[in-house]
Amino acid sequence: MRLTGPWKLWLWMSIFLLPASTSVTVRDKTEESCPILRIEGHQLTYDNINKLEVSGFDLGDSFSLRRAFCESDKTCFKLGSALLIRDTIKIFPKGLPEEYSVAAMFRVRRNAKKERWFLWQVLNQQNIPQISIVVDGGKKVVEFMFQATEGDVLNYIFRNRELRPLFDRQWHKLGISIQSQVISLYMDCNLIARRQTDEKDTVDFHGRTVIATRASDGKPVDIELHQLKIYCSANLIAQETCCEISDTKCPEQDGFGNIASSWVTAHASKMSSYLPAKQELKDQCQCIPNKGEAGLPGAPGSPGQKGHKGEPGENGLHGAPGFPGQKGEQGFEGSKGETGEKGEQGEKGDPALAGLNGENGLKGDLGPHGPPGPKGEKGDTGPPGPPALPGSLGIQGPQGPPGKEGQRGRRGKTGPPGKPGPPGPPGPPGIQGIHQTLGGYYNKDNKGNDEHEAGGLKGDKGETGLPGFPGSVGPKGQKGEPGEPFTKGEKGDRGEPGVIGSQGVKGEPGDPGPPGLIGSPGLKGQQGSAGSMGPRGPPGDVGLPGEHGIPGKQGIKGEKGDPGGIIGPPGLPGPKGEAGPPGKSLPGEPGLDGNPGAPGPRGPKGERGLPGVHGSPGDIGPQGIGIPGRTGAQGPAGEPGIQGPRGLPGLPGTPGTPGNDGVPGRDGKPGLPGPPGDPIALPLLGDIGALLKNFCGNCQASVPGLKSNKGEEGGAGEPGKYDSMARKGDIGPRGPPGIPGREGPKGSKGERGYPGIPGEKGDEGLQGIPGIPGAPGPTGPPGLMGRTGHPGPTGAKGEKGSDGPPGKPGPPGPPGIPFNERNGMSSLYKIKGGVNVPSYPGPPGPPGPKGDPGPVGEPGAMGLPGLEGFPGVKGDRGPAGPPGIAGMSGKPGAPGPPGVPGEPGERGPVGDIGFPGPEGPSGKPGINGKDGIPGAQGIMGKPGDRGPKGERGDQGIPGDRGSQGERGKPGLTGMKGAIGPMGPPGNKGSMGSPGHQGPPGSPGIPGIPADAVSFEEIKKYINQEVLRIFEERMAVFLSQLKLPAAMLAAQAYGRPGPPGKDGLPGPPGDPGPQGYRGQKGERGEPGIGLPGSPGLPGTSALGLPGSPGAPGPQGPPGPSGRCNPEDCLYPVSHAHQRTGGN
């Protein structure tokens, strides 16, 4: 079998690292058996603890208990009334480590102040306790019981004065640290006591686990439980804080986010009383005076265990409107229009009145991809393009003839630095580099290939390698001595450096590195092939004004655009627009000639002129001599030359390609209203609420919209016309990725790189927190008139209509069927008098005449409450509510894309005075007026309809014990119980009457000789009798125990099976000799009927067994002998009572 790289690495680590340690520590078992536990705020101190690595079990979540607010700032588990018993294997699927700690935070209520209850208990398959934490309110003690290796149950009782506040009906924290031979008890973050223990037995995790249960009847105890956790470390309980139960609350901050120093001084001593020993105040319950800046994102947490399915939540309040959505996908590129000819310069218009700033128009959709336009003139040199993948080297062309020397141009502006490109193909060897010593990896005497005399330059920085495979789990450390809690160790010395790991697999390409230092110039290389055209650069500086071009032809009128989409958020106010066209009013009277003005300042630089005509090609130079040289590196920039004389203006060039979109101009005056556009064809969505109810019964009303699919790509355009003039083409499409090059040597760390390319649009994030209502935006322009909408949802129920005309009196109907008396409503449906004759309802008669109003009857007695109905079907969506109060101003929207600047048109004639325009858009909401005078008292309204059923309230506080109820009706036949107790010996019955004389039998077969007795059958019969007596005595004792173990034992039996069928009677046999006493018959079938009333007291002096008395003093050990069931059942009676404390 061939081993791959990762397997070789694993095998190497297994051989060399595994022998280092052969012991198995608790830490490995902890990592294997305990999940990661969620820790809240200041629950643990941060000394030597990484909150992401705390492991353990939250028993409240494991028992699927619901949380509810028991105070304004605290939540508690709802214990309910069901038994809090679960299979242990479901709570601890992989068991518990040898050392662990239990942390609980609770408040004892009044009813449980003196009760004895189990905080946590683990039972084995025989329902015998293995681990128990008992809180006894009557004795004011805490007990910890566990099973030792010898099989005895050891009981450690903590009876300390410091434990008395645990029962004062206030919040307290109780913690127990269980180590191999030490038990420590903590209360309110203080160490109360510590006990040495015997070695504990292994725990059987195939039984049951109980929490917060009364010892008397196994029902949940009346406490408020905030926390019940098991940490998979015995030392974590010492790191618990008591910030939740401390009465030190952080004060209100002043306007500057500070806390008064007097408050800190006054509460420092009070807070220190809640801190554990040897711990400083600065580590505990600090009040943060001001919120700091957001930290860096934390490391991703490991995935948690799948939680239980939660119950459907109640309908939340309507959220505030969300933020504007992300920018939609870019539409198809618009068609490229023909270049219009430049019009003549218009005459200077009369000064117009400053128009009002118009509202920003709606952003139009991008048009479909148009055919390619005519080829434009060569544009200015653009900035360096994005890094291209290395293309294949072209064939070396012949050297061209030297051209005529052109005029020296002006020095251009320094372009922005280009983005770093990928590593190019290996270049030719450079000049001799400086030798450097690189440790023991490279030798300065190493030589290159024979054909290259000089050493190469330092290569570009190599790509970052992939992360190596994770190493195998290290050897297990030996178990350390149990440390003293609270002692903070000093910082250890720095460890020895680890062994250098094996080289990882080649990584994925890393991010482009920063630009390296400028290298020394290389040898002059051969002239390379012409590179591809870079992307279009930004507009260059404005050139000198060119001559007026020939007037262009009138362009073709574009098609009418589609109506805009949904009105977007109002954009930012645009820059001040240019002066609008002359007003439509009549020209005013000519004014008087003004005085000549002072000479104005120098005007701005004119626009760039049109490009000149291509120069004539130069003469062909002589053929060069020599071998083509290598491609040289780019030389240093030359000094700026002397500015040459200004050239003659060139001839008008051909029209250029349209430039980039200009900056949006200032808003002009509002135009006249256009003709009504085509209505938008909206898809028929129908009633969303009704559609949702067909799929789910508990959906929210809002539904995300469907995402449009991307349209198909347009077909190829028509082939272009052949152009005889060979000009440099536009930049071509990006070529396919080249073959990955070999991994270069690791380069030095470069400088900080330039900002990267903006990333792609990410996935849609979760719905954010509703923001503060924005200020009212400016009123948008009136939209186009749409088509008539679809019929709206059904309106609200109208008011009651007027009474219809009275109908004719109908014939009397037959008597109805008597109504059965059920649900306490019989008095409403009884038919009085006569015999109830069954009949069927007749056809409905016409409405009778309206009778006179009868006298007001006496108020009826309050009826019994009806049964709780089933939840109704979700109703249709109600009508829209009244418009809400105007919100605050929203954030300014993103500026719209700049429009294409239009060509200046010819000046038109002055028009006549137009008709009054349409009514303008509604103005912004005015300032709220003062409250008006209160109106007169209105007429008393009609009583409203009955409101909907309220939400279910939280569980109330248990009330006082009620009075003794009446005797209940006999219940249904219960399940088969455990074997009943053996009753006391009954009185000897009277002699029965002799039976009827039977028919004489035929002579029997001679019997077996008397001396051939089967001792095996006698032995079997004795064993059966002894077993029967033992089971009956055992059942008596179990029925008298009021413990969860006794309750669980009763649940272990199944239901009785159906009685078997009677067999056919056999033929009468011959009477044989008198046989031995028969065996015990099978248990008879259960009797039919309700249990009988208690019988009269028996005449025997022996009464029924009494309830167990209080445990007496321990007696001397008795002699070994037979086992009494009362002594063998529950080992707790032989537990070693080990008390401690004061």
Curated annotation (Swiss-Prot):
Regions of biased composition (Basic and acidic residues) lie at 335-350, 444-463, 478-496, 720-731, 743-752, 943-954
Gene Ontology MF terms: extracellular matrix structural constituent; extracellular matrix structural constituent conferring tensile strength; protein-macromolecule adaptor activity
Spans annotated as Triple-helical region 1 (COL1): 292-351
Q: Name one GO cellular component term.
A: collagen trimer
Stretches for region Disordered: 288-680, 704-1009, 1053-1142
Compositionally biased residues, Low complexity = 390-404, 640-651, 1093-1107
Tissue-by-tissue expression: Localized to vascular, neuronal, mesenchymal, and some epithelial basement membrane zones in umbilical cord.
Q: Which UniProt keywords apply?
A: Cell adhesion, Collagen, Developmental protein, Differentiation, Disulfide bond, Extracellular matrix, Hydroxylation, Myogenesis, Repeat, Secreted, Signal
Q: In which broad location class does this protein mainly occur, judging by the first location in its UniProt entry?
A: secreted
Quote the subcellular location field of this record.
Secreted, Extracellular space, Extracellular matrix
Annotated function = May act as a cross-bridge between fibrils and other extracellular matrix molecules. Involved in skeletal myogenesis in the developing esophagus. May play a role in organization of the pericellular matrix or the sphinteric smooth muscle.
* Domain-level remarks: The numerous interruptions in the triple helix may make this molecule either elastic or flexible.
From the Swiss-Prot or TrEMBL record, give the protein name: Collagen alpha-1(XIX) chain
